[in-house]
Amino acid sequence: MAFGKKPAQNPLFKRKRYCRFTVAGVEQIDYKDVDTLKGFIGENAKITPARLTGTKAKYQRQLDTAIKRARYLALLPFSDQHKK
């Protein structure tokens, strides 16, 4: 190994994902909790899939419904084109 070079990190290493709702002991996801819901929406206002967030299927369904209800009540934007 040459001096000044760091050993290469494993490019295939991925951090283990976990369900935030299971860890917190949440039973029901509420549409009024906008701060939590914003964490599961991308910058273009799309719902982030469970394979990226690590959310379990049960909570992903609840999350999907809660985000759609919050959008309908204008608590969250439908798209990124809305003015802030």
From Swiss-Prot:
One of its GO terms (biological process) is translation. The keyword Ribonucleoprotein applies. GO terms for molecular function: small ribosomal subunit rRNA binding; structural constituent of ribosome. SUPFAM superfamilies: Ribosomal protein S18. GO terms for cellular component: cytosolic small ribosomal subunit. The keyword rRNA-binding applies. Coiled coil: none annotated. Keywords: Ribonucleoprotein, Ribosomal protein, RNA-binding, rRNA-binding. Belongs to the bacterial ribosomal protein bS18 family. Binds as a heterodimer with protein bS6 to the central domain of the 16S rRNA, where it helps stabilize the platform of the 30S subunit. Part of the 30S ribosomal subunit. Forms a tight heterodimer with protein bS6. HAMAP family: Ribosomal_bS18. PANTHER family: 30S RIBOSOMAL PROTEIN S18, SMALL RIBOSOMAL SUBUNIT PROTEIN BS18M. This is Small ribosomal subunit protein bS18. The gene is rpsR.
